[in-house]
C-alpha cells in the first residue's frame, strides 16, 4: 500500500532522529490520512503535532526538522514533495512512479491483492443471522445474513482469525409454541378438527413437520398428555426448521463454522456455572425491578408481566448492570428460580469471550435497546466494552414496480428470503443488500434487481468486469499479448481519468482495511460502483476522442491494457469480498454480446 510506504519513511526518519538526539523516541501514534482536498497532497501526517509537547518544541518548527529527516530517509525517491501546513501538519505528495508501481503490485498479488495484516491474527467471533428456528428466513433475516457475511469476509481479508457463528434459540417459549402448533396439525392429519390459536405458527412447513411425525409415530401421541410429546415435537421441529434455514443460507452461499445451541448451554451446565460465577463475584442480588412509570396526573399502572412472565412486583435475582452503565439492574433469575433469556444470552457471551479476543454481534435494529445491557455485562465480566461490537440492521421494504410487497402469495406470510433469491438470483440479492449502510432502511426493488440494465447496481459492476474481460479477448484477437509491467510505458498513463483509476486501484487495500475496522461492508459496494463508473467514463471518453485502450500506439496500448488488467483484478477481488461473482461474459444492456461493445 502506498500509505504503508509513507508510514515506513516517517517511522524510519523519526527513529533516526531519536537516535541522533534531535527529539525523543516517538511512539507509533501519528496518523497518515488522505486529506479531503487533493490540493493539499496525497496524505497528511500529524507526527510533529503528536511529538511536539514531548520534544518541547513548537509543532511547525519540529515539522521542518522531521521533513528534512524524511527527505534523507527517502533514498528511493518515492516522495515528490513535503510541505508544512496549518498548525504543523506535513502534507505529502508521492512520486508518480510510486503510484504506477501499485499497478504491478495489484497484478502480482492477484486474488490476494487487498489482503492486509491489520488484524494480526486476533480471534474474532462474528455471530449473525441467529434467526429463531421457528420458520423459514424472511428478507429481513436475509439482510442480516448478507451484512454479517460481509463483515466476517472483510475481517478475514484484514488478517483476523474469524469464526462464523449462529446462535440457535432452541430452548425458550417460541420453540414450545412451534411444537404445540405442530401437534395441532398432527391431530388435524388424523382427521380431527382443530382451531389454531392466534400466536401459533401457520405456515405450510408446520404441516410438513406434522406429516413427518405422523409417518414415524402414527397415532401414538394423539391423546397423550403434553409432557409426553412436547420435548420430542420441539426437538424434531427445530431440526426440521434448521434444515430449512441451512437451505436458505446456502441459496446465498452462506455457511457457519459453529452452530451454538441455547439448549446445550443449559444441558452442559454452562448457565448454572455462569450464575455461580455471578454470585461469587457479587454481581447479583435478590430484589425487585423499579415499578412502571406513571403518566403525568395518572395513578401508577399495575405491574404487567413481560414476555417471560416477569413483573416488577416479584422478588428476582438481579444482575448489577446499572453499576456498569445500564439504565436498571436486569433480572437473571425469575421468582421461581428459572433463568431468564438475558441470563442465557450473557452466559453465551461469557462463553464466546473465553474463545475469542473480540466479539461481533449482528442484530436487528429493534435490539438497539438491548446493546447497553450487553456492554454492561461485558464490562462486569472483566472484559472491555470495546471487545464487543454490535452491528445493527435496519428494516427491508420489498418493492415491486414501486409498490410495497409485504405478503407472499405462495405462503400467505412474510416474503421469504428463498423466494427473493429464486426470483432475482444470489448475486443481485447479496449486492443490493449492501448498497446502503446497515443502520439505514433499505428498499429492495425486485424488478430492478432482475433488470440487465445499468441502473441495476450489481449488473453495472459485473458488466464493467465483463467489459474488461472482453477488452482482453479483443486484444488477443488483434495480436496483442497480455503485457507485463513496464514503467516507461506506464508513464504514458497521464490523463486525469487514468491517474484517477490508478489512485483508486492503489486505495483498494486501505479501503478494505478501513471497512473491516468499521464493520461496514457497504463501503466495498460503494467503492466498486464509484470505481466502475470512473472506468466506464474513461472508456467511453477514449472511444469518442480516439484514445481507445487498443489503439495504434503500441506503448500506450500496452500501458492501458496493464491498467485494465490491474483494474479487473481489483473488481474481481472486491466482488469476492462481498460473495458476488465476477463474470467474464455478459449480455450488454442493449442485449448484444459485450464483445461488440469494445
Curated annotation (Swiss-Prot):
Pfam families with a match to the protein in the record: Arg_tRNA_synt_N, DALR_1, tRNA-synt_1d
Residue ranges of the motif 'HIGH' region: 131-141
Span list, region Disordered: 288-309
One MF term in the entry's GO annotations: ATP binding
Gene Ontology BP, a term: arginyl-tRNA aminoacylation
Gene Ontology cellular component annotations, sorted alphabetically: cytoplasm
Family matches, as CDD domains: ArgRS_core (cd00671)
Annotated compartments: Cytoplasm
Family the UniProt entry places it in: Belongs to the class-I aminoacyl-tRNA synthetase family.
PANTHER family: ARGININE--TRNA LIGASE, CYTOPLASMIC, ARGINYL-TRNA SYNTHETASE
Name listed for the protein in its UniProt record: Arginine--tRNA ligase
Record organism: Anaeromyxobacter dehalogenans (strain 2CP-1 / ATCC BAA-258)
Lineage of the organism: Bacteria, Pseudomonadati, Myxococcota, Myxococcia, Myxococcales
Amino acid at each position: 500500500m502506498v500509505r504503508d510506504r509513507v508510514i515506513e519513511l516517517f517511522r524510519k526518519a523519526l527513529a533516526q532522529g531519536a537516535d541522533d538526539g534531535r527529539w525523543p523516541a516517538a511512539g507509533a501514534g501519528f496518523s497518515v490520512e488522505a486529506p479531503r482536498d487533493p490540493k493539499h497532497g496525497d496524505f497528511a501526517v500529524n507526527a510533529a503535532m503528536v511529538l511536539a509537547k514531548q520534544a518541547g518544541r513548537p509543532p511547525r518548527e519540529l515539522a521542518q526538522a522531521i521533513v528534512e529527516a524524511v527527505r534523507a530517509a527517502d533514498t528511493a525517491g518515492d516522495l515528490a514533495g513535503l510541505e508544512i501546513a496549518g498548525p504543523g501538519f506535513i502534507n505529502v505528495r508521492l512520486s508518480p512512479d510510486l503510484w504506477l508501481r501499485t499497478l504491478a503490485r495489484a497484478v502480482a498479488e492477484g486474488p490476494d491483492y487487498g489482503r492486509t495484516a491489520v488484524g494480526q491474527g486476533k480471534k474474532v467471533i462474528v455471530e449473525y443471522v441467529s434467526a429463531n428456528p421457528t420458520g423459514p428466513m424472511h428478507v429481513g433475516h436475509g439482510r442480516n445474513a448478507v451484512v454479517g457475511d460481509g463483515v466476517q469476509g472483510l475481517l478475514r481479508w484484514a488478517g483476523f482469525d474469524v469464526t462464523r457463528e449462529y446462535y440457535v434459540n432452541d430452548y425458550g417459549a417460541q420453540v414450545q409454541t412451534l411444537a404445540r402448533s405442530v401437534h395441532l396439525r398432527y391431530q388435524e392429519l388424523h382427521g380431527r378438527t382443530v382451531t389454531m390459536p392466534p400466536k401459533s405458527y401457520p405456515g405450510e412447513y408446520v404441516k410438513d413437520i406434522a406429516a413427518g411425525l405422523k409417518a414415524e409415530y402414527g397415532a401414538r401421541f394423539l391423546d397423550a398428555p403434553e409432557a409426553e410429546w412436547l420435548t420430542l415435537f420441539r426437538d424434531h421441529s427445530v431440526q426440521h426448521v434448521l434444515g430449512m434455514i441451512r437451505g436458505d443460507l446456502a441459496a446465498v452461499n452462506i455457511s457457519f463454522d459453529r452452530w451454538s445451541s441455547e439448549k446445550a448451554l443449559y444441558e452442559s451446565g454452562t448457565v448454572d456455572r455462569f450464575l455461580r460465577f455471578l454470585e461469587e463475584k457479587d454481581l447479583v442480588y435478590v430484589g425487585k425491578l423499579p415499578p412502571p412509570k406513571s403518566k403525568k396526573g395518572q395513578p401508577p399502572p399495575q405491574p404487567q408481566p413481560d414476555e417471560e412472565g416477569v413483573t416488577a412486583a416479584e422478588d428476582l435475582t438481579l444482575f448489577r448492570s446499572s453499576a456498569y452503565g445500564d439504565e436498571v439492574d436486569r433480572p437473571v433469575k425469575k421468582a421461581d428460580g428459572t433463568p431468564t433469556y438475558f441470563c442465557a444470552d450473557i452466559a453465551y457471551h461469557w462463553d464466546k469471550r473465553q474463545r475469542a479476543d473480540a466479539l461481533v454481534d449482528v442484530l436487528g435494529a429493534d435490539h438497539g435497546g438491548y446493546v447497553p445491557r450487553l456492554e454492561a455485562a461485558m464490562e462486569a465480566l472483566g472484559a472491555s466494552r470495546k471487545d464487543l461490537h454490535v452491528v445493527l440492521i435496519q428494516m427491508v421494504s420489498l418493492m415491486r414496480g414501486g409498490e410495497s410487497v409485504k405478503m407472499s402469495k405462495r405462503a400467505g406470510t412474510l416474503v421469504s428470503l428463498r423466494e427473493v433469491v429464486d426470483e432475482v438470483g444470489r448475486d443481485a440479492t447479496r449486492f443490493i443488500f449492501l448498497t446502503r449502510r446497515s443502520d439505514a432502511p433499505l428498499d429492495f426493488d425486485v424488478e430492478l434487481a432482475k433488470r440487465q440494465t445499468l441502473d441495476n447496481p450489481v449488473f453495472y459492476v459485473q458488466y464493467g468486469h465483463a467489459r474488461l474481460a472482453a477488452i482482453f479477448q479483443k486484444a488477443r484477437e488483434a495480436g496483442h499479448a497480455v503485457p507485463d509491467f513496464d514503467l516507461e510505458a506506464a508513464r504514458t498513463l497521464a490523463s486525469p481519468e487514468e491517474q484517477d483509476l490508478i489512485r483508486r486501484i492503489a486505495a483498494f487495500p486501505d479501503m478494505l482495511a478501513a471497512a473491516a475496522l468499521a464493520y461496514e461492508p457497504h463501503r466495498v459496494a460503494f467503492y466498486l460502483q464509484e470505481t466502475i463508473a470512473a472506468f466506464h467514463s474513461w472508456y467511453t471518453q477514449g472511444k469518442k476522442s480516439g484514445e481507445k485502450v487498443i489503439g495504434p500506439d503500441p506503448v500506450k496500448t500496452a500501458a492501458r491494457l496493464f491498467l485494465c488488467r490491474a483494474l479487473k483484478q481489483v473488481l474481481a477481488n472486491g466482488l469476492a469480498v462481498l460473495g458476488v461473482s465476477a463474470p467474464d461474459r455478459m449480455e450488454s444492456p442493449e442485449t448484444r454480446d459485450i464483445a461488440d461493445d469494445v
